[in-house]
């Protein structure tokens, strides 16, 4: 196996000098430089993929360079503007729009439709990668929130059937919210969870109108989503004025007196580390929807793969992307990392994995943040959070929503 795993820009610079314009000493061989994010995939997975790909494509060498999330936005933008960019970059699914705005990405629409079966992609990965009808980001993997529950507390309450609708969910959560026990721990500013409730009501966080983006919390649909959030949040003691990391909800759940939290399945590892008595006692189910026919909408996080326009080996890079996004290596990735694969048609590859299967059901209804290149400006000083707190503390929802919309609109312009 020829690949090298490198970390950091200093090593990147020296490796480029060694391979010289991406060519190997043989003359026609190509070095495909891939930037992957730290901890996205295991070394074992990369070893398997690289060995198999290089065996099938002997003129190609894969050079994987591991990147830190901190500061990655500026680093990618600099790479897109340089003459020495990597050939493939893993990016967060909600970051594609800002990179596409630089006009530095290769349009992969043809490959998406012709070779990759884009009609089956998860919407929460595919939609953020599509800008004005052109596909720049190729979905790679997804992760989203589910309900993590304490099986012992459910059993003690006599709950045998997991909820499939919002109404059922509220009913059992009220049953579980007794005495010193909390039915659910839901922090007041968990805006990712609120987003799903708003989407369930056919609302939006923001929309583009006349070429400009505007906040859309002050609509009947979005306000209904906030109303449901308030009902659910009241069935526990989560703080109204902070988010899910202050304090960390995994630590709160690990105390053993909380029946449910809304979190990504991999949080179960943290919970069990904090309280080993909970090993084997955690269950998972999709966030319930308004009806039993479909789960609730959820915010989908994950990664897309992009190919810079200034890649030295664009065609060869696209072939590597097609392999990574194809069924064989998507199946391997899902089983190795417990991720949701990039297509709804691959959901059966994770059967038997309770947590990942629950996540995959929800991912079919997944969405991402508004596809504005300036959405990151909203999250810097997120006005959705104080809006939520205001409503939970009794302020008129329309008044609070209008104030938040003004700030969202300003951040997007």
Regions picked out by a protein language model, each given a short descriptive name:
Residues 93-144, 197, 283-285, 350-355:
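Hinge/lid segment of periplasmic solute-binding proteins
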Residues 339-341, 358-407:
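C-terminal capping/gating helix-and-loop segments adjacent to ligand/active sites or protein-protein/ligand interfaces
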Residues 37, 96, 227-313:
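Extracytoplasmic/periplasmic substrate-binding proteins
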Residues 1-33, 55, 406-413:
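Short, low-complexity disordered leader/linker segments with a strong preference
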Residues 86-87, 115-153, 182-183, 294-297, ...:
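A structural signal for short loop-to-beta-strand junctions that line the ligand-binding cleft
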Residues 52-121, 128, 155-157, 164, ...:
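Extracytoplasmic "Venus flytrap"/periplasmic binding protein-like
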Residues 173-177, 212-242:
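Glycine-centered hinge/linker elements that transmit conformational signals in sensory
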């Amino acid at each position: 196996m020829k690949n090298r795993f490198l970390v950091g820009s200093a090593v990147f610079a020296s490796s480029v000098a060694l391979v010289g314009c991406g060519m190997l000493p043989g003359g026609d061989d190509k070095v495909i430089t891939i930037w992957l994010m730290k901890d996205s995939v295991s070394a074992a997975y990369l070893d398997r993929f690289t060995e198999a790909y290089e065996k099938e494509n002997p003129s190609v060498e894969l050079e994987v360079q591991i990147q830190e999330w901190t500061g990655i936005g500026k680093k990618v933008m600099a790479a897109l503007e340089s003459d020495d960019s990597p050939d493939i970059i893993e990016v967060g699914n909600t970051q594609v729009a800002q990179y596409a705005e630089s006009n530095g990405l290769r349009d992969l629409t043809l490959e998406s439709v012709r070779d990759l079966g884009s009609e089956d992609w998860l919407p929460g990965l595919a939609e953020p990668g599509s800008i004005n009808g052109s596909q720049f980001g190729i979905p790679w993997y997804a992760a989203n929130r589910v309900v993590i529950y304490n099986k012992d507390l459910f059993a003690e309450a006599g709950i045998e059937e997991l909820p499939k609708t919002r109404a059922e969910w509220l009913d059992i959560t009220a049953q579980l919210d007794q005495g010193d026990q909390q039915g659910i721990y839901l922090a007041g500013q968990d805006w990712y969870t609120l987003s799903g409730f708003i989407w369930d009501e056919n609302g939006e966080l923001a929309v583009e109108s006349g070429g400009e983006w505007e906040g859309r919390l002050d609509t009947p649909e979005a306000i209904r989503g906030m109303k449901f959030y308030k009902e659910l949040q009241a069935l526990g003691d989560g703080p109204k004025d902070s988010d899910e990391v202050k304090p960390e909800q995994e630590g709160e759940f690990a105390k053993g007196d909380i029946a449910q939290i809304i979190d990504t399945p991999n949080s179960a590892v943290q919970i069990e580390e904090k309280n080993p008595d909970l090993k084997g006692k955690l269950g998972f189910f999709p966030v319930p929807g308004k009806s039993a026919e479909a789960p609730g909408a959820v915010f989908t996080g994950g990664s897309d793969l992009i190919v810079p326009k200034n890649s030295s080996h664009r065609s060869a890079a696209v072939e590597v992307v097609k392999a990574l996004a194809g069924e064989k290596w998507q199946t391997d990735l899902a089983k190795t990392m417990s991720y949701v694969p990039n297509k709804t048609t691959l959901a059966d590859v994770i059967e038997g994995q309770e947590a990942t299967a629950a996540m995959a059901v929800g991912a079919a209804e997944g969405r991402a943040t508004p596809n504005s290149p300036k959405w990151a400006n909203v999250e810097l000083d997120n006005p959705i959070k104080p809006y939520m707190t205001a409503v939970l503390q009794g302020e008129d929802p329309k008044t609070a929503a209008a104030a938040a919309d003004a700030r969202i609109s300003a951040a997007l312009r």
